[in-house]
Amino acid sequence: MSKYMGGKEASSVLGVHQRTLYQWDKKGWIKTIRTKGGKRLYDVGSYLADKDEESKEDHKLSICYVRVSSNSQKDDLERQIKFMKKKYPNHTIIKDISSGINMNRKGLNKIIDLAIEGRIKEVVVAYKDRLAIFGFSLIERLIETYSDGKIVVVRKKENQEPQEELIEDMMDVMNVFTARRNGSRKYSNK
């Protein structure tokens, strides 16, 4: 949408002085055209559309997501939080204490809700499995599609073959089910 206006009208619409418009033109902040007589016409429509896009971006959140599996790992959770705050001081921290297989986590649900609302700029995780052992690519797609955001994995496992990744996923699943079985056995023996 481009709507060109003279200096007086443009300054009235934008709420700035005509000299300010002239400075913005010199800096390239607003598009202008010149009439044959040399009068400047300002593209107020495009300027307002650009500002609207910028304000939408300003409302998007940058999030650091941290997670541990159990309350006994709270020390690790605190280390993750400390690391993320140091490396990403302007990000919001969202934390969970729950299994990576459990997709019904309070923090994860909040991230999904924010993504669907289009309010996520980026989500930073230490490792992919901190966000989700299974379904990482689904969450990534939600964030990309609805929020035009991204997931940043800080510590990637370099040059991992697909077979190695599959074996690692299977080991994660086995560990979770073993821990659940041993945990339930522990309580039944009491």
From Swiss-Prot:
Source organism per UniProt: Acanthamoeba polyphaga mimivirus
TM region positions: none
Cross-referenced PROSITE patterns: RECOMBINASES_1 (PS00397), RECOMBINASES_3 (PS51736)
GO molecular function: DNA binding; DNA strand exchange activity
Protein name: Putative resolvase R80
Signal peptide: none
Pfam (any one): Resolvase
GO biological process, one term: regulation of DNA-templated transcription
InterPro entries xref list: DNA-bd_dom_put_sf, MerR-type_HTH_dom, Recombinase/Transposase-rel, Recombinase_CS, Resolv_N, Resolvase-like_N_sf, Transpos_IS607
Entry-linked SMART domains: Resolvase (SM00857)
DNA-binding region range list: 11-30
Residues at the catalytic site: S69
Role noted for this protein: Resolvase catalyzes the resolution (a site-specific recombination) of the cointegrated replicon to yield the final transposition products.
Location of the Resolvase/invertase-type recombinase catalytic domain: 61-190
Positions in coiled-coil regions: 67-92
Keywords from the UniProt entry: Coiled coil, DNA integration, DNA recombination, DNA-binding
Family per record: Belongs to the site-specific recombinase resolvase family.
